[in-house]
Amino acid sequence: MPPRNTYEKGNPKRQNSPYYKPSFLRREETTNDEEKFQGHGLKTELHSALKSSNLNLIRRTYQTGENPYLSDPHDRGSSSRFNRRYERGLKFYQKGEISKRIAQERTLQKQQEEEELKRKLKQEEDEKDKRKLIESGDLPNLELHEDKFLLDLSKFKIYYDNNHGYEWWDTAYLDEKGELMEKYDMNGTSPAEEKLAEDIDEVDDDDDDEHPSIRYVAHPLPEKINEAKVSIKAYLTQHERKRLRRNRRKMAREAREIKIKLGLLPKPEPKVKLSNMMSVFENDQNITDPTAWEKVVKDQVDLRKRKHLEENERRHEDAIKRRKEAVNMNVEKPTVYHCKVFQFKNLQNPKIRFKLKMNSKELSLKGLCLRIRDDGPGIIIVVGNEKSCKFYENLVMKRIKWNEDFELHTNTGDIKMDMHNNSISKTWEGYLQDCKFKGWFMKVCNDQDSLLRTLGQFDSEHFYSPVQT
């Protein structure tokens, strides 16, 4: 039995040895020349590329065409790139051929640019024409999707032919042939009108002939448009108002003087005073009784003064009345009233009383302020809208300094009052369905019973609490 071949197991160290050869390359000692190598396959000498295991060496050394198993005599790629270049031959450009080709390319490019410019200009003109047609209503506006409401021309032609070329609202006055019915003939009148014309003696037939369709049309009344311009009120300064009043009075005085000169108005009596009574009557008549004349002048002066005072009083009353009416018109009666109740220990300081009174008047509050004697405790009730009551609460609770000392002015002299123990507190806040207060007033009561009776007149005695004071 021959010894075991340890190299056939594929030991890599042994295979890389220079003394190692594959089994198919080992020569056999035989006398047969035909069998030079031992192995399976064709009895052909192996290619030299198969004798090396270095692939990089094979790739550099051998070409594809040299491999008889891979080479193709009809394959042009088997030759090298240099051989292919020589097979094509050398081609030389003629003189001016390159410049001519470049000029042709430039000319072609210029023509393409001109055509593109013409196309853009034509497209812009088409867009303008299309926009005009859309504005005139000849084409639908695609942005508003008007194309969805286009009329089908085929259906419209059938409709147009069936109605003899008239609209649907005119078909009621046409016969089957598409002609106007006899009773609606514009050249004549209807049978009902002819019968009515026989009963009436005077009938104006010309109007019916000229306007025969008026009797079938309901004409609406033309709307009257007020073309009067709305005048914007101008707000003037005090100096401008004075100048305007002065000029207006001057123009009225000049107009009155012109009427007196023309005799349209009687001449006014002279304004006689004690200082000018002699000069007034020197030109008219002699004074026989100066004492009586002096009495007449004094009576005229008193009369003018009395009229002047009465006129001022009347204007003052009218102004007050207008202001009250304006306030009543602007102020709406609320559904509920906001009410706040405060109780204090002392209200001798006249500055505090003035602030309470003036703020209640300016804020249009209703209610009262009662106190027991000048140096006693009291109560404040205010009723109004929520904003005014909130402002008044801020005044009473934060802005007014109740514990601030002050000097009380009396007939005997000034007395310094110590108010460090004085204070005020809010006892109640809420809403009232009805308000019995007509306005806001202040009152000094002699005792607590008198204060409660005053509150009872307005159903407010439950607001007062002696414990708080």
Curated annotation (Swiss-Prot):
Composition bias, Basic and acidic residues: 1-11, 25-45
Biological process terms in GO annotation: mRNA splicing, via spliceosome; spliceosomal complex assembly; spliceosomal snRNP assembly
Main location: nucleus
Intracellular or extracellular location(s): Nucleus
Keywords recorded for this protein, A-Z: mRNA processing, mRNA splicing, Nucleus, Spliceosome
One cellular component (GO) term of this entry: nucleus
Nucleus keyword on record: yes
Sequence segments annotated as region (Disordered): 1-45
PANTHER family, A to Z: U4/U6-ASSOCIATED RNA SPLICING FACTOR-RELATED (PTHR14212), U4_U6 SMALL NUCLEAR RIBONUCLEOPROTEIN PRP3 (PTHR14212:SF0)
Quaternary structure annotation from Swiss-Prot or TrEMBL: Component of the U4/U6-U5 tri-snRNP complex composed of the U4, U6 and U5 snRNAs and at least PRP3, PRP4, PRP6, PRP8, PRP18, PRP31, PRP38, SNU13, SNU23, SNU66, SNU114, SPP381, SMB1, SMD1, SMD2, SMD3, SMX2, SMX3, LSM2, LSM3, LSM4, LSM5, LSM6, LSM7, LSM8, BRR2 and DIB1.
Note: Present with 432 molecules/cell in log phase SD medium.
Physiological role: Participates in pre-mRNA splicing. Part of the U4/U5/U6 tri-snRNP complex, one of the building blocks of the spliceosome.
Identification of the protein by name: U4/U6 small nuclear ribonucleoprotein PRP3
Species whose genome carries this gene: Saccharomyces cerevisiae (strain ATCC 204508 / S288c) (Baker's yeast)
